Amino acid sequence: MSLIKELAVVHGRVVLSSGQEADYYIDLRRVTLHRHGGPLVGRVLLDVCAGWSFDAAGGLTLGADPVGAAMLHASGGAIDSFVVRKAEKKHGMQRRIEGPDVAGRRVVVVEDVSTTGASPLTAVEAARAAGAEVIGVALIVDRGAGDTIRAAGLECRAAYTLADLGLA
């Protein structure tokens, strides 16, 4: 949590991807792509997912990309990672999900930080359309999305809340 407070929390007026305005921004890419933060994120998210049986972790690009990869590495090869594109490619194999095939597999959708739940729920929809069984959503920081994700019938767990970071 200290790396998040030190590297990721930026104070100042910002517009979030949800369109909402806020007095601070949590830029977790500063942690997930950091030489010390990335490996730690993988271990922490695997702990968050304890008790869930799953084969792969991934989510909507870009925030989820390093999170899924960190979990893959921290698992010692026990799980795969996947990336959900915002839109299907118009060339090549025209895939929406990159990485190992998720069809018939139990997956966890991950996200670095979520305010409204829109990104993880978009990834859930894409994973299900590709034939995956989504068993839950795991967030590094729940900025308020947990209730929306649970209302969609999914279990949602987070490593940290705004209160944990002293932001609530």
Q: Which residues are covered by each model-predicted region?
A:
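PRPP-dependent phosphoribosyltransferase catalytic core
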Residues: 2-6, 125-168
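Short loop/turn motifs at secondary-structure junctions
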Residues: 53, 77-78, 131-133
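Short, well-ordered alpha-helices that flank and scaffold nucleotide-derived cofactor binding pockets
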Residues: 47, 69, 73, 125, ...
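Short glycine-rich phosphate-binding loop at a beta-alpha junction
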Residues: 52-63, 138-139
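Conserved acidic residues
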Residues: 55, 105, 135
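Active-site-facing substrate-recognition patch
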Residues: 1-52
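Short, glycine/charge-rich flexible loops or terminal/linker lids adjacent to PRPP-binding catalytic cores
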Residues: 65-108, 115-121
